[in-house]
Amino acid sequence: MREDFKKFKDFIYKKRVGVVGIGVSNIPLINFLIKLGAEVTAFDKKTEEELGEVSSDFKNKGVNLELGDNYLDKLTGFDVVFKTPSMRIDSECLVKVKKEGAYVTSEMEEFVRYCKAKIYGITGSDGKTTTTTIISKMLQEEGYKTWVGGNIGTPLFAQIEEIKSEDRVVLELSSFQLMTMNLPMDIAVCTNLAPNHLDMHKDMQEYIDAKKNIFLYQDATNTLIVNRENEITYGFKAEAKGVVREFSSKRELKEGAYYKDGILYLSGKEVCKKDNIVIKGMHNVENYLAAFIATKNDVSIENMKKVAESFNGVEHRCELVREINGVKYYNDSIASSPTRTLAGLKAFDKRVILIAGGYDKHLLFEPLANEGYPYIKELILLGQTKEKIKDVFKELEASKGIKINISEVSTLEEAVKKAQNLARQGDIITLSPACASFDMFPNFMIRGNKFKEIVNEL
């Protein structure tokens, strides 16, 4: 049973509240806290000029602003501090303010604490956004008012009083959001786990432990969904306190969701045929299986099938940009890890011209070479990691005699131009970087949009 939001309203009134980060999720949060009568100070590395209208709007509402390089120096003397998701709880300034007696929390934690509706929480290394979107589409098709939040959708805490107990909430949750989560999800879904974000986590174990928080606080009334074919997530079963349901793309599961001979099943009943699913690739079959077993008690097989046969995917995920002179250009900018790029490559029915490389998250690229080479016709590399990726393909050539032609470029424009020159009629060109974007772009969406802009100008 979740807590009554009145408790939070009474608690926050007249409190001195620090909000770290004036980003997408925190702007509505700050406005909401003002409305609830809190005395708010907002902290951000950006300057007043960079924030523009946002800073003048907040100042007019009585928000104190601490901005610029040393913006966290004055994070002291607060009753409550809302941290930004990427901020580690063991960061010096948070440890200090906590010692002073401040209650340190986040928008997502407070939302889960007070939300009346049934919550589906989705995490994993790959497939989170697509699975979250599929689940929300199926719940909508069934007739539920559905709210989507977390990493995608809109910040929901500011809308908490509008959400009714009969509604459904679907949250995409990152390892950063889960690191401090100690509240139960009604349905927790873990799509898969592979090394990721090792630039932000101390090691792989810390990353796994963060993901586990999606189910560790559940009880017997809650449900955990695990991928039978992913060793790490299947291992979660032993620690689960609620019902565990499984999905598999490789074996029959009497009580789960599974794929066999071109058909997706739920508890032995056919839901749909793989060839009729609009978004291609076995990774999307797995996303659908996870969604089917997660929504088993809320959505009819008929509505599951309807969504699978009509939903055409999420932007920046194997997204067809255009076809020019018989060459198809795909934007898979979301692929910020080697496993994600591999899944994208396997979705195509031929070898492709791959544009890869970017910010270094300290991931190993050997799997991209060893498992990816049969799917790559030409490899175009750019960004911080281009030498690291080139080295693993050169090692493949030295050890197994398998040679992939590699071109190195400095910009995305050069990469697209090079790909266009290499391509012949019938070829596929895909931007699937296997890396984050931060060396050249603020995020994967801006990278993907830049790619689309370049392709559309060809």
Swiss-Prot record:
One of the record's GO cellular component terms: cytoplasm
Pfam families from the UniProt entry: Mur_ligase_C (PF02875), Mur_ligase_M (PF08245)
Coiled coil: none
Binding annotation for ATP: G124, S125, D126, G127, K128, T129, T130
Keywords (A to Z) from UniProt: ATP-binding, Cell cycle, Cell division, Cell shape, Cell wall biogenesis/degradation, Cytoplasm, Ligase, Nucleotide-binding, Peptidoglycan synthesis
EC number: 6.3.2.9
SUPFAM superfamilies, sorted: MurCD N-terminal domain, MurD-like peptide ligases, catalytic domain, MurD-like peptide ligases, peptide-binding domain
One GO term of the biological process aspect: cell wall organization
Catalytic function, reaction form: UDP-N-acetyl-alpha-D-muramoyl-L-alanine + D-glutamate + ATP = UDP-N-acetyl-alpha-D-muramoyl-L-alanyl-D-glutamate + ADP + phosphate + H(+)
Oxidoreductase listed as a keyword: no
Listed InterPro entries: Mur-like_cat_sf, Mur_ligase_C, Mur_ligase_C_dom_sf, Mur_ligase_cen, MurD
GO molecular function: ATP binding; UDP-N-acetylmuramoylalanine-D-glutamate ligase activity
Compartment annotation: Cytoplasm
Biological or metabolic pathway of the protein: Cell wall biogenesis; peptidoglycan biosynthesis
UniProt family annotation: Belongs to the MurCDEF family.
NCBIfam families: murD (TIGR01087)
PANTHER family: UDP-N-ACETYLMURAMOYLALANINE--D-GLUTAMATE LIGASE
Protein task: Cell wall formation. Catalyzes the addition of glutamate to the nucleotide precursor UDP-N-acetylmuramoyl-L-alanine (UMA).
Name the record gives this protein: UDP-N-acetylmuramoylalanine--D-glutamate ligase
Annotated organism of origin: Clostridium botulinum (strain Eklund 17B / Type B)
Chain's gene name: murD
